[in-house]
Each structure stands twice: as C-alpha cells, then as structure tokens.
Amino acid sequence: MKILDLRGTWRCRTDEAACFTAPDGRWEGSPFVLPGSACENGIGTPLHYTGETDPDTLRAPRQRYAYLAPLWLQREVDIPADFAGQAVTLFLERVNMASRLWVDDLEIGRQIVELSAPHTYDLTGKLTPGRHTLTLRLDNRDLLSLGDMASGYSPDTQDYWIGVVGRIELQICPPCHVADVQVYPAADSVRVRVVTACNVHSPERQDSGTLRFQIADADGGIVTEQQNSVRLFTSKQVNYFTLPLPNAHHWNEFTPTQYTLVTEFRCGDDVDCTETKFGMRCIAVQDKKFYLDGRQISLRGTIDCAQFPLTGYPAMDKDAWLQRLGTAREYGLNHVRFHAWCPPEAAFAAADELGLYLSVEMPLWLNRDIHVPEVGDDPAHRSYFLQEALTISRAYGNHPSFLFFSNGNENLGDFSLLEEITAAVKAIDPRRLYTLTSNFDHPLLPCEDYLCAFLAAGHPVRIQHCQDRAAENTALDYADAVADTPVPVISFEVGQYCVYPDTDCIADYSGAMRPINFEAVRKLAQQSGVHEKRQAYIHASGNLAAKLYKEDIEAALRTRDFGGFELLSLTDYTGQKTATVGLLDVFGRSKGILTADEFRRFAGPVVPLFKAKRIFTTTEFLDAALSLYDFGPEPMQDLCYDVTIREGDAVFCHIKTRKPMLHIPLSGLDHSAQLDVTVAVGTYSNSWRIFVFADTPDTALPTVHTPAELEKICETGGRALVPRELFPEQIPCNFVPVFWSPVFFPSKASCGVMINAAHPALQGFPTKAYADYQWKELLENAVAFCIPKNDKAVQPILENVPNFYDNPPHHPAGRSA
C-alpha cells in the first residue's frame, strides 16, 4: 500500500445555517489545519465567561470556540501518474459525527455517520492523474438522537468538536488487494482461523490467485508459513483458512505476547501485502467465572470517559495511550472499561502491548431517567447501532486486548433491540464476551455472558449500598450476588467519592478547552473565604476517599469467584457538574494522596486480605481471618502469613503463621491506640488500621446550658457537653462524602473532616488528621455550626470539608439529640 498524506492546511467554509448543499466549485476560505478541530483553528463562537457560578457553568470545561453545524473543508491534491488504474481509498481516522465527500463536483457515495471507526471512501476510478479538488462536508450535530450523555458524544467529555483527527490520507493499492483480514485464535491454542476479504477488479469473470501467509513471533522469526490457491468470482471474495500455530505463547496481562500475520495476495500482475497483529488468547465463561486460556482471571478496572482536557478530542497516537493506559497498569489494574464510547486504534495497540483487558461500548447511553431518548425511540437506532457494533467488531476485533463488549451505559428502553444487536454480533465474532448494557440488574438473556451492574440478583455489589456493614469490619463480600447470578458479576462504577477540587489545575488548560467549571468553583471558594484551605481540604477529603476506595476494592477481592470491579474512577471526571472523584486529576497526575505503590498493595494481582472488626477494647482479642487474593502470574505456594502490628513506629506484635487465623490479646495496651496491621505473603503486603479503646469507666462532664456559660468555658478552658440547642444554625454531619457531584446530585453534605489530632480535647481518642471508621457513628449523629467568614480567631478542632457548591466553613459541634 502507498500513502498520500493529506495532513496540512485545508480551506474552511462555515455553514451555521446548513444552507449549502454542494461545494459549488473551488472557493476561498479560512485556513484550517488537519488533523485538528474547528476550536483549535479558532473557528466558531468565542466562549465568554463572566464569572457565573450556576449549575450550567459548573457542568464541564468548554471549548474556547464552539461550533455545532455543518463545516466545509477543501483542498487540492495532485495525483501522480503511477496511481492510474490503482484502487484508491480516502481514509479519515476519526470524525465527529458525519462526513460527505466530493471529488471536484462529483459526490462520492453517501453521507457516512460514524463515531467509533474511520470514515473511508472508495475513490477508485474517480482520481485520475493530475490535480483534483477534494471537498469534505463535516457535521457534528446529533443526527442519531443520541442525547447528550454518552461519553462518545457529550459536552461533559469531548464536547461537540468538529474536524478530522488521526490519519488523513489516500491509500493506494493494486486493483486486486486484501481488503480485510480477521484472525480467530482457536480454543485449543495450536491454530488460528483466518478470514480474508480480497477485492477483485474483474468480478464479471472467474479468476484465480494465491494467498500466502506467514506468522512471525515478536522477534520476527517465522513460526508458520502456508500458501493457498483461491478461485475468485466476486468483487469482494471472502475465504477461510486454518493455520497451525504449535507451541504458541498466550497473550495475557503478564505475558502480552503478540504475533504478526503477513498476508500476501497475488492475482495476475497484482501483488498486495498486509500485516495483522494478533494475540493467542481465548476468553470464556465456565461455572460463572472468567477464564482466559483455561486460567481464571479477575478484573481490576477503572473507567475511561473520553476526557481529553487539552484537545477536547481523543488522542490518536500510541505513545499518548501508552502513558494514559500505563497509569492504570502502574496502579495495579488490569482492566479498563470505555464508558459509552469506543477509543481509536492507538488505544487498542497500546493495551495490547500493556496487557490490559478492555471493555468497549458504543456511544449509547439512552434512558429517560437522564432526560434523553430511550433505546429505540428513534427508528435510526435500529439500523445504526447494529451497524455500529459490527463496525467496531471488524475494525478492532483482531486486538487481543478487546475482551468485552457492551452496547453502552445504563440503557433502558427496547431491550429486544439490544438483544438483537448482541446476538448478531456475537454470532459473527465470538472472540470476546458480551452483555446487553453496562448497569441495571435485569433478567439475563441467553446472549449475555456476564453482568456489569451495582445490583446483581437484587444484591448490592458496591459498598455505597452497605456502608453501615462495611463500617463494622473488613469482612464484607458479595457472596450472595455470586450465588444468585447465573453469570460472572462485575461491580459497576465503584466509588464515586467526591474529593475537594484542586482549582490550581486551571493553569494547566493550555489548549482548546477552558475550565470555566473550575473557575466557578474557585470563585465560590473565594466568596466563602475558604480558597486558601483548598490543599488541606484535598488532603482530608482525598484520604477519606482513598480509605473508602480501598474498602470497595477489597470487598470485591474478598468475594470468591467474583468477576471483578470497575472504579469510577482512578482519575477525575470533570463533566456532569464537576465530579472530582479521582485520586488522580484529569491529566492523570497524582493528588498526593496515595502513591502507585501504595494503591497497588490493595489493587494488584496478589493482595493479602484481613477480616476482622475495626474497633476493639483492651479487654478483647484481635480475632482475624487471613486470606490471599491470588491472581498473579503463578499461584502462590505454601502460604506463610507474616503479620506485624504497630502503634506508630513501635512494634506491638509480630507473628509468622501458616494458619489463616489470628487470636491476639489486646490487654498489653493500657491506653487507647490506633494500630496498623500489616500482612505480608512473600513480597506482597497490605495494611489496615484498627482502633483499640481503653476499657475505662465513663467520665461525667458538666453540661453547658446557656450561651453565657459556653462563652465562659471557652475563655477559661475546660471540658463540657454543649447541647445542640445552643447553636442557632444546625448543619447535619456525615461520614461518607458527597456522591459524584454535589451539583449533579444536589447535596449539602461534606466531603470529609479536617481534624486537629494533637488537640488536648482528643487526648485518648486515636485519630489521624482525617476521618476513619472510628468517626462514622460520631459524625453521623453530630451537627455542625458555621464559622464566621475569615474569622482567624476560630481554630476548630474538627472542621468539615465542605463540598464545592456549599462552601461555608463549619465544624461538628456535638451529637444530635
């Protein structure tokens, strides 16, 4: 294949009224650089932000130039003489969402509406040697009744960019050439089935040709070679072959081995050659568990919501995706779910190299609960989404990382349509596992291989729905859900704990997007006098969120034969009214809460687990059960648990045992303490914090009855109980932080609490500078009062971390009646 690169400067003509129907010859226009978007080229309505702090402003970053209408691009191209008689294709790697093409004044084919795969136009016979004018009409309007929620088409994520990104080129092949190659590894791992589609220039008569195959390993060594004669009698001839591949190396997260299939097609004087990378792997379900090449796997995942804060459109080069997806691997994860969108080729190639298991979706999030159409409300859904699913399968199906497919996110409506799509694609392409939709517990259909939801058979499978149980001990699991669900279960969008936003990121938005939502957050904080506390707020809320993420993850790991979990998410989501739920920001940078090594200790392939109460007295024993989540490269053998219990730097107890049980007296403590329990198995270790309270009689405290008495004790010092009635403005407290976004799901709840752990009032009460489970009951039964704005004299012992939309500083004052 020869390539004629069309990147560079085109001419642009805007069409906000959608009044132009044809190019009308050559025209002058504004310069437009491809690859790129209208926003990057300064085309559209400039964004004017004047300081609003309303919910719409807080929705998401916005393009600096907005354009939602048809857009025309034009340029000349010089076709060399040796292109005569060749097959020519225009390749546009990614367009949002529709394109039409003219060569000179001739329209080529029909409008392509496609969000997930390249737009291609067959120009064979249309581009003779010499100069021609190419004209593109792009259209980013919602032509498919998608609504505005799916990550693949939403102002919350990519925004409605318009342009062409990635490769933009003319591809020139011989008239007889290989149009497509699909590789299907066999379950026995010693052969592959190869399906070729060859374009033939003389379909009016039978012809003959040869297809020669070579399979090379990662070092370039030829491991299989085969030649086949084929009879050709149609313009796109499909042939099926089986190639032996003995002693194949499997592709997986630990050994992401890939092979290269070289396909050479000869027909008369035409010779065409193409390369296809693939991995030897077979995914299956057995006994409600995932198996990859006969070995059980467990998914530890996060979600990618198509947020690209500098460009507003997906990265199209592999290096960018190696960095983006490599972060998930660095943090111990082996799985990424693409939320209501399908990434470009470069993402799959990077995941293949990294050994990541991908779940891919169409740009489909349709249900009336979020004020958009439901599945099937528009007749276009029936034809478009089936074709979209088939296109995704064909375009990216050879990638070994592409293990799971869902039609989209949280879909409701015509489930028979989703069933038709799933059954049809699964019948054609069995290389992955399928489910109707991500989320929503529903009666499972025969075409579904797994369930991804937050309820399974009516049972919750994320801690959001069982926080009280999780607070009692470290033993929560989802065994009931596994027992009552006939397929593997993946817990859906685990976490969503709001961390106070870091508005310092505003300076990092140096590209097409302007973070007016973060500018509004900053203004609200400045108005409330808390902007200078933002880093302390991030530390306190982030550490609480990290604690809760750890509990969520470990509940999944403790559940025997559980399919896995998907976090929402490792990184912030800056749309949907600003959901800063990540331990990393939207640029993939750490917030300084946990390092990758610390996170991997409880989210990696091998994780020691500890089941025990969280709160004890000094008269009790620490009774605990030990176990190992063991999904490493090889099963651990002859387990020995190395247990160290520390109070600060001092070792309280150290035990090595092969028995998975602990029975340790706590009577050696004569004071209240927080103990850090570390369990190590080989080179893997994990830690938990438990709280031990001295078994001492309650000490009676005087009760303050009037404001004057309260003022006196504040002046002279001392301890007293202050009833809530003395505070005119009572704000309920909470332990679990705001879910997702306090604007998307309106909430006045806090995001944690800052604690002056060294204050004498907390003497004898073990605590860090942020909340842990020993605070849960106290906070949930407490009220807070507001601190006067900019009152430096008030130094609270506890201060709530406010959510960014309800910013007045306030601190817990005592238990409610």
What function would you assign to each model-found segment?
Residues 428, 568-631:
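Aromatic-rich peripheral "rim/lid" segments of glycoside hydrolase catalytic domains that contact
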